[in-house]
Each structure stands twice: as structure tokens, then as C-alpha cells.
Amino acid sequence: LLAYIGENYRDKIGSYKIITNGTIEPSAELIEIMQKYHVAAEISDYTNGVPQLKEKIESVVETYRKNNIQTYFLSAARWVDFGFEDVQNNYTIEQARAFFDYCHTRCRGYVDGKIRYCINAFFAERTLYGTEDINNMLDVVNMENTEKSRRKLVEFDLGYNEKGFLLMCQHCNGTVEINQHFIEVGKQCQNR
């Protein structure tokens, strides 16, 4: 996907980057694609909450830097609690649509050949309920290189979907820009 976007749209993208927690060493193929299309790496620093990650993250940072990949090391003092297990908003359809539009998460994800509009909702729904909201996915593996497909991709990224919201909006406090429910980094599972 990174190569496809780079090949077809890189000249139209100002900032092109991946975000990682730095715990997985990038493959040679990923490094090559990032070099070719000038993809930067943002590595979230969770070492204050999870100090045992420090050595691994430093190794990943070094891999990116020695391969001339622009690398940003982001310190995060806290996370937000999306509330997926505990929140029951009981929104009407109109309220759910308004919440979805207000939230307008920018956190897309790519899993199993599909782009997920809200990657946090995808993982929570799959983990908690074993289901997947069709409004939270766009199959890009079988997507054709047509004007119609490109329009569909842009509309999906802008948040257009059949319902106007995602099912997990009923169980969510919202994305980082609107969420005021904070938790310490790496401490969200302290009772497990």
C-alpha cells in the first residue's frame, strides 16, 4: 500500500509517514519503499510507562536513521481512554452522526488488505465483539485504478459511509483531539 500510494500520489502528498510504537524492526522491503518515496517514521516513545521497551525502540530508531529515513521520536506523557468496554452513549442516529463528524479521527489503519477508517474502533470491535463494521473498512486490494475508485478512497478518508457513523461510536469517548479521559502510558491494563 505504501508503494502504491507513493507511486501514484506521492507528488500530491506533503507529509508522508508511518506511525509505529517502535517494537518491530522494519523489513528491508519497508526500508526500501520508505527511501524511494521519502516516507518518514514517527516512533511513539512509551518508555516512561514501559521502560523495558527502551533498548528495542532505540534499535528501531537506529535502523531508520542509518538508512536515511527521516525519523521523529515522539514523547507521549499520556494516552486517552477510548472507553470501548465501559462507554454506552445511547446516541440517536443523528447524535451518532454528529459525534462521528465532530470526532473525525485521523487514525487510519491497514489490516488484511483493508483500510480502516478508525483503527481503534476496528481493533476494539474485533476484540470485544468478534465483529467488523462494514462502514469502517475499504477493501483496497481489489480496488481498480479508476476515477470512481479514487473518488471512493477519498470519500472514505473524509468519513463518508452509508450510516454516517461507526457502530463503535456508541462505545467511544472520541479521538485524542476531543477526548478528555486520560490514562498513563502503558498503564491501561494494570488489573490484568
Task: Describe these PLM feature segments.
Residues 1, 9-26, 38-77:
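Core AdoMet radical
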Residues 2-7, 97-100:
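Short, electropositive alpha-helical surface patch
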Residues 28-32:
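Catalytic cores of alpha/beta
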Residues 61-124:
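A C-terminal junction/extension of Radical SAM enzymes
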Residues 68-81, 120-180:
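C-terminal accessory region of radical SAM enzymes
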Residues 102-108, 168-173, 190:
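Sequence contexts marking disulfide-bonded cysteines in secreted/extracellular proteins
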Residues 110-112, 177-182:
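Extracellular/mature segments of secreted proteins
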Residues 183-192:
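Short cysteine/histidine-rich metal-coordination sites, predominantly Zn2+-binding motifs
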